A protein has these predicted regions:
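Active-site nucleophile-adjacent alpha helix/oxyanion-hole segment immediately C-terminal to the catalytic cysteine
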Residues: 1-69, 161-164, 169-173
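Cys-His-centered catalytic/binding microenvironment captured across papain-like cysteine peptidases
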Residues: 2-10, 25-27, 31, 108-173
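Conserved active-site-adjacent core of cysteine acyl-enzyme catalytic domains
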Residues: 43-143
Length: 173
C-alpha cells in the first residue's frame, strides 16, 4: 500500500512516537538500515548517515553498528519473535524487486491481531508495510533490541564511569 500520509497543502504533519520510538523516513532509497538505527538510537537519521554513509548497509554492518553504539541487542537464528519488545527485521522490499528492506517490529503477543507493530522508514509515495503488519508475510535476520545507545558510545559515558572502568582494567592481577 502506498504511503499516502502526506499532510494537506500548507499544513505540517505532526509525527507522534510509536511505543516510545519516533518514526523517521529514510533520506534515499537505500538508507532503510540507517533510518531504523536512528529510530532505535532516538537521533535524527542525518546523524547516522553522517557516521555510516548513505549507501546500502547489510545485516553484518547493522550488527557492527549496534555494537559500536552500545545498543543492548540479541540476534536470533530463527525468525519467529520470542521476546517482547523491539526488533530489527529484514523483509522483502515492496519497492525494489529482489531487494531486502529493513523494518522495526514491536512484538507484544497480548496486543491482539498478530501482536506486532511495524515502523517502516520508506518515504512518501512508496509502498509501505502497514503499521499492524497485516501485509507482512515473511521476514528474517531478527535482532531484538532495547532502544537507546549513543553514536558517541563509549565516549558518551559519564566521567565517573570511565574512571571506574579505567581503574578496573589497570589493576594488578
Amino acid at each position: 500500500m502506498k504511503n499516502s500520509s502526506a499532510p494537506p497543502v500548507g499544513q505540517q504533519r505532526m509525527v507522534q512516537p510509536v511505543l516510545g520510538l519516533m518514526p523517521q523516513t529514510q533520506p534515499n532509497d537505500v538508507t532503510c538500515v540507517q533510518t531504523c538505527l536512528a529510530m532505535a538510537l532516538g537521533v535524527p537519521v542525518a546523524q547516522v548517515v553522517a557516521r555510516y554513509g548513505d549507501k546500502a548497509l547489510n545485516q553484518i554492518a547493522l550488527w557492527h553498528a549496534i555494537q559500536e553504539c552500545g545498543i543492548v541487542a540479541n540476534a536470533f537464528v530463527y525468525p519467529p519473535p520470542v521476546c517482547r519488545g523491539w526488533h530489527f527485521i529484514a523483509a522483502p522490499s515492496l519497492n525494489m524487486s529482489g531487494s531486502e528492506h529493513q523494518l522495526l517490529m514491536h512484538y507484544e503477543p497480548d496486543d491482539g491481531s498478530q501482536g506486532i507493530t511495524i515502523l517502516d522508514p520508506a518515504g512518501e509515495g512508496k509502498n509501505v508495510y502497514q503499521r499492524d503488519g497485516s501485509n507482512l508475510k515473511s521476514w528474517h535476520s531478527l535482532i531484538w533490541f532495547n532502544p537507546g545507545g549513543s553514536l558517541d558510545w563509549p565516549n558518551g559515558m559519564d566521567e565517573g564511569r570511565r574512571t571506574q572502568d579505567s581503574a578496573n582494567t589497570t589493576g594488578h592481577l
